[in-house]
Amino acid sequence: MEKKLSVSVAVITFNRAEWLKDALASLTRQTRPPDEVVVVDNGSKDHTKDVVLSFSDRLNIKYVYEPVRGIPHARNTAIKNATGDIIASIDDDCVADDNWLKQIEIPFIKDPHIGVVGGNVTYFRVGEGSVEEFYIKNMSSRLETGKRE
């Protein structure tokens, strides 16, 4: 029998309420739903809190306001507030694939020595000449295959 692990999703955000809606909506579509979602608002002046609370009927969601600015501090705040056996992190401008959490959980179930997993990133909202466009054209296939040239 497989061990049941709890999964918390940590989301750090700052003044991107509109993008946060898409990220949180993607968590509602997970084939393996999150046990909790911890959203750390890193000092937003927009309607971030309202967006988070609007998902409380679909997700077990916790809003945490963190006035000390900075991604590392905000991530640590999310980790301190998470209760899951596994803590998955997603940025506020990301949309998770429907199987994202299911795929994250599998290695932890198969091997109790696993500590960290990662996955592929698919970019959207990419503008011509952007860093993301360069990465997609030149780097992403190398990372996925381990190719060096």
Please tell me what each predicted stretch does:
Residues M1-T28:
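N-proximal low-complexity "stem/linker" segments adjacent to membrane-targeting elements
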Residues K21, D46-S54, N99:
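Acidic helix N-cap motif at the loop->helix transition within catalytic regions
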Residues S26, P33, D41-D50, C94:
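A conserved acidic beta->alpha catalytic loop
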Residues D35-G43, V64-P67:
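Short beta-strand/loop segment that forms part of the nucleotide-sugar
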Residues E66-A82:
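Glycine-rich, basic loop-to-helix element that forms the pyrophosphate-binding segment
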Residues I87:
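Short aromatic/hydrophobic "clamp" motif used to bind/position activated sugar donors
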Residues G119, Y135-E149:
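Short, flexible, basic/aromatic active-site loop/helix in glycosyltransferases
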